[in-house]
A protein has these predicted regions:
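Alpha-helical transmembrane bundle of multi-pass membrane proteins
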Residues: 1-198, 224-443
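Short, well-structured alpha-helical segments
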Residues: 212-223
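Solenoid-repeat scaffolds in large eukaryotic assemblies
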Residues: 199-203
């Protein structure tokens, strides 16, 4: 049974995931109005969509630095401030350039939260429920995506400035996130790593009073072993977790997930749906994502990370292959015009159950304490570099190569992911962070 305090701290920290998801998806309802308002070319339009992702890449690359130096909790507070400033600034932006600046700041918050939030939750969670608790971050991401899609749908017809309202409502959860963060403690592993033994033990006592001494000894022993080795992430003993994190994050994005999240209304319009139906279908994607992430998070500690990835990979291969065939044959009117939306709903279900539920859990588990923030930053930045590439190039390739070839590429990448999971992915369920370190790190 998870301590109520640990659950509360995890839920609060996972609010960073809600803002992450909302910020990611909200632009899908505003992008066409923004393009028309400022008369953007296709290149400028692509840059407008991807500027937040560029900020996200930088936030992910460097988010481990304040997390290590200032602490996990203080870094999360600054992330909340970035979300708030971005939401208000983008909603009130008088021109394209300041709009881009504020979207960039929001991207920094997304990137840094993808490093610090899973990291913090993994460091306060007991081994037997770590998957579920860290999975709250991904659950809140998709909850944020769903909320953004529904918000966009409800605000779409309120007037010519509806896109400003779509972007501005994000300020409300950002304020809540900032205020609640003053009720969470610092990570006990970060405190012990920085020699603050009494404070670290106090937090461990709040987590599980019966195991304070054993947990402290295990963490300090692991840190002592790490202290005999290089703290550089690129040292040879960290080769296995580094390769696992990079590969996992790479495959997460070449599944095409963010192309579908960002451009869902346009993809549906390509199949002949009207704008209103396309926006509503996008909200359906958010709902499916929400439900199957909830399922994945609830079973990840029972069936394990690897099993979820195997099931998901097979489902993604099947659905992407069928979507590609639909575009090749142009038979969009089958099943009342709902063939492609139905297949993409199934695609989202398989993704949410597997990659969506697993990625932040797995990457937060596989690095030792001394380099965990750096490793999380590496996995997150790889994820966001690929997300930026996909978001920036998807409109171009969909137009030049067609939907069939584009979705066939994503399908091929998922075949490679299946091989990766079968050959190289270890199982980490039910193992302490220090136990995972013994398995993956060469001492």
């Amino acid at each position: 049974m998870v301590q109520r305090k640990v659950l509360f701290w995890s839920i609060v920290t996972a609010l960073g995931g809600f803002l992450f998801g909302f910020d990611t998806a909200v632009i899908s309802g505003a992008e066409k109005a923004i393009q028309q308002l400022w008369h953007l070319s296709s290149v400028e339009h692509g840059f407008t969509i991807s500027i937040a992702l560029i900020g996200t890449v930088l936030g992910a690359m460097f988010g481990g630095i304040p997390s290590d130096r200032l602490g996990r909790r203080q870094t999360l507070r600054w992330i909340a401030v970035l979300y708030l400033v971005s939401a208000v600034g983008a909603a009130l932006a008088p021109a394209w350039v300041p709009f881009m600046v504020f979207r960039f700041l929001g991207g920094l918050g997304v990137g840094a939260s993808s490093v610090t939030a899973p990291l913090y939750i993994s460091e306060i969670s007991p081994a037997e429920s770590r998957g579920k608790l860290v999975g709250l971050f991904q659950f809140n991401i998709v909850f944020g995506i769903l909320a953004a899609y529904l918000s966009n749908y409800l605000l779409a017809n309120v007037g010519e400035h509806s896109w400003r309202l779509m972007l501005g409502v994000q300020a409300v959860p950002a304020i809540a996130f900032l205020l609640f963060l003053f009720r969470v403690p610092e990570s006990p592993r970060w405190l012990l790593l920085h020699g603050r033994l009494a404070e670290g033990k106090d937090v461990l006592r709040l987590i599980n009073p019966a195991t304070v001494e054993a947990d402290t000894a295990a963490i300090l022993t692991a840190q002592a072993l790490a202290g005999q080795q290089s703290e550089s992430l690129w040292a040879s003993q960290y080769r296995t977790p580094v390769l696992l994190a990079v590969a996992f994050a790479f495959f997460n994005q070449v599944s095409g997930i963010n192309a579908i999240i960002y451009y869902a209304p346009r993809i549906f319009e390509m199949t002949g749906l009207g704008q209103g139906a396309a926006l509503l279908s996008s909200a359906g994607i958010g709902l499916v994502n929400f439900c199957f992430t909830l399922l994945g998070v609830n079973v990840i500690d029972r069936f394990g990370r690897r099993t979820l990835m195997l099931v998901g990979s097979l489902g993604l291969i099947a659905t992407l292959g069928l979507v590609a065939m639909a575009f090749y044959t142009q038979r969009f009117q089958l099943f009342g015009g709902l063939l492609v939306p139905g297949l993409l709903f199934a695609y989202i279900a398989f993704f949410a159950f597997s990659q969506g539920a697993v990625i932040w859990v797995f990457i937060s588990e596989i690095f030792p304490n001394a380099v965990r923030a750096k490793g999380q930053a590496l996995g997150s930045s790889t994820h966001w570099v690929m997300a930026t590439v996909i978001a920036f190039t998807f409109p171009y390739f969909a137009e030049r190569l067609g939907g069939g070839n584009t979705f066939a590429f994503f399908c091929g990448m998922m075949v490679l992911q299946l091989v990766f999971v079968l050959r190289f992915m270890p199982e980490t369920k039910g193992t302490s962070l220090e136990g995972v370190e013994k398995t993956l790190v060469m001492h």
